[in-house]
Amino acid sequence: MKVLWAALLVTFLAGCQAKVEQPVEPETEPELRQQAEGQSGQPWELALGRFWDYLRWVQTLSEQVQEELLSPQVTQELTTLMDETMKELKAYKSELEEQLSPVAEETRARLSKELQAAQARLGADMEDVRSRLVQYRSEVQAMLGQSTEELRARLASHLRKLRKRLLRDADDLQKRLAVYQAGAREGAERGVSAIRERLGPLVEQGRVRAATVGSLASQPLQERAQALGERLRARMEEMGSRTRDRLDEVKEQVAEVRAKLEEQAQQISLQAEAFQARLKSWFEPLVEDMQRQWAGLVEKVQAAVGASTAPVPIDNH
């Protein structure tokens, strides 16, 4: 860091002699930078501030910066600062996730998804900064001995745009983390409230029991015996009431069973009568026919017997 601050100081003193014209910063960037470098001083915000300071130094495109851009030193420094920022951000996110345990699973998943998206955007834009510098180094080396004013102007424009994107990413990430932290605080308060609701009745019961034991200890033996007798009597009455209720339930069930049996018996009787009527309708014609045949047979037999018993006439000569 001492080397970094020394480089910044040298850049500031030599700014007037730089070959490249310094880019004009928008008026709103100081406020955004203040937000990006962290109002609460979280480790990830401090790490992002170090990345930010290094980017501002690179953005000056002073002679020293141009010399170092021809070597991989700048990109290595940016890589280190990027890794440090993302590491601190992941650690802070893990800490908030532990505090979010009492929150509903759906809410926790939604907040985690939004935070991961904001974190990914910040990482992608930081990676874009490094890629632009690598591309610039390659183009400068390819144009060795030629004018690189156009390349430097293009790089300065790209860095300004990327800087604005990084500011927006940092601001969005701070807002997401604030929502995440608020959810963790709300979940913790809800968990404490739930514990208080569970323990409240138990504490009240303990207090009542303690008061009862204290009052019983101060009463004479006769009063305690009388109170015990009343409690036993109340208990017996309660048991008797429960028994009567149970008997009433059994009676109702027996009555229901009896009604069902009577209904089934009536149905069986009706079915038997219907079956009897059906049998009668089947066999009645047959019986009548047999009776007719029998009557005819009897008449024939009687006629035959009458004919055989008639007197034979005697011939007198």
Curated annotation (Swiss-Prot):
Sequence repeat ranges per the UniProt record: 80-101, 102-123, 124-145, 146-167, 168-189, 190-211, 212-233, 234-255
Gene Ontology CC terms, in alphabetical order: chylomicron; extracellular exosome; extracellular matrix; extracellular space; high-density lipoprotein particle; intermediate-density lipoprotein particle; low-density lipoprotein particle; multivesicular body, internal vesicle
Residues bearing PTM Methionine sulfoxide: M143
Signal peptide (UniProt feature, chain positions): 1-18
PANTHER family documented for this protein: APOLIPOPROTEIN, APOLIPOPROTEIN E
Protein family according to the UniProt entry: Belongs to the apolipoprotein A1/A4/E family.
Protein name per the record: Apolipoprotein E
Source organism of the structure: Macaca fascicularis
